[in-house]
Amino acid sequence: MKNFISINGKKTELTEEQVQQIKASFGFNSVRLSSVDVGETVKIGDYELIVLEQSGDTTALICKDFIESCAFGDSNNYDGSKVDKLCSTFATGLAKIIGEDNVIQHTVDLTADDGLKDYGSVKRFASLLTTDLYRRYVYTLDKFKPDAWWWLTTPYSTPTHDHTSWVKCVSPSGCFSNGLYDFNVDGVRPFCILNSNIFVSK
């Protein structure tokens, strides 16, 4: 990723050392994302994120705090829901800070808790966790338990079983539960995958 500065309308490319010097002058402790251990937090703009996994040249992260608390949407289908749109807005904001190329699109499996696949899968630049991803990262997530319930993408069931009301969520203790899509007001914690070569603040 190239870095530029504009002075009097003239665009000049900065070396990595110059970038780090500028950041240091503003009091930022700037490090490469790839150097941050799983379970540590980093700051990107106003967001504090937990490192969940380092894999090759990418890093999986989740917001430490909720970006909002709200109802899930108009049904228990994540695709196009209110929480889906909030995550997309989060991804757009992140891309403005670190560059679009550094936010990696991932597949969100919308398989229901009972195994039904009515909702298929979607591709997103930021999303909520699925139940499978929560299980994958549970030991890291347990170190950062919020004091409130928060949404996952996974539906309890689907129209095939005449059930479109419930969505999986996580309790303050870290257990799975179910929330009504239009009643429960739960937290939104976006998950994303970023290029691990970027610089972040600690």
Q: Locations of the language-model features?
A:
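Collagenous Gly-X-Y triple-helix signature in extracellular proteins
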Residues: 2-202
